[in-house]
Amino acid sequence: MSALVCVARIGAAHGVRGAVKLWTFTEDPFAIKRYGPLLSKDGKRQFEVAQAREAKDHLVATFKGVTTRDEAERLNGIELYVAREKLPATDEDEYYHTDLIGLAAVTTDGEPLGRVLAIHNFGAGDIIEIAPPKGASLLLPFSNAVVPEVDVAGGRVVVALPQEIAGDEAEER
């Protein structure tokens, strides 16, 4: 089996007929219906979306076989996964977060910075979190100016540290 990629998280029950709040991590929230059965993290449980409708910042969905509020409440917090090969190919300069996490981060001079820990989006654009070998994580804009090169096959991202951060590092040395 190929690597699994998290595409959604089940939230609280919604109503009394087995519906749940569903937060999707896909560009098109309704894409999760096209991936076929979704899997639990361990791959042992399958979930098939029966219906989904848009809500404020999530979907309200029902799964086949889940018909009561009690059943829906037991699903709260479960992350849903699909096999990596079921996801569509990315365009140039587009990446799945899962492909970036764990890559080595180096400066434009080739100096090691650490590893990509996560990609966040707090509403104003993507942020790349880099965990250095010691010290606090670096949170940087994930833009072409700050991350001019992403080499997934080579296992690294190149980071052009903003002057404020580069200057802070120079003072610490």
Swiss-Prot record:
What highest taxon heads this organism's lineage?
A: Bacteria
Q: Could you mention a single GO BP entry for this protein?
A: maturation of SSU-rRNA
Q: Which InterPro entries match?
A: PRC_barrel-like_sf, PRC_RimM, RimM, RimM_N, RimM_N_sf, Transl_B-barrel_sf
Leader sequence range is: none
The gene name reads: rimM
The record's GO CC annotations read: cytosol; ribosome
Query: What is the protein's given name?
Result: Ribosome maturation factor RimM
Q: For this protein, what is any one GO molecular function term?
A: ribosome binding
Show the PANTHER family listed in the entry. Answer: RIBOSOME MATURATION FACTOR RIMM
Q: Which family does it belong to?
A: Belongs to the RimM family.
Main localisation: cytoplasm
| Quaternary structure annotation from Swiss-Prot or TrEMBL | Binds ribosomal protein uS19.
Specify whether Repressor is a keyword of the entry. no
Q: Where in the cell is it found?
A: Cytoplasm
Tell me the domain comment: The PRC barrel domain binds ribosomal protein uS19.
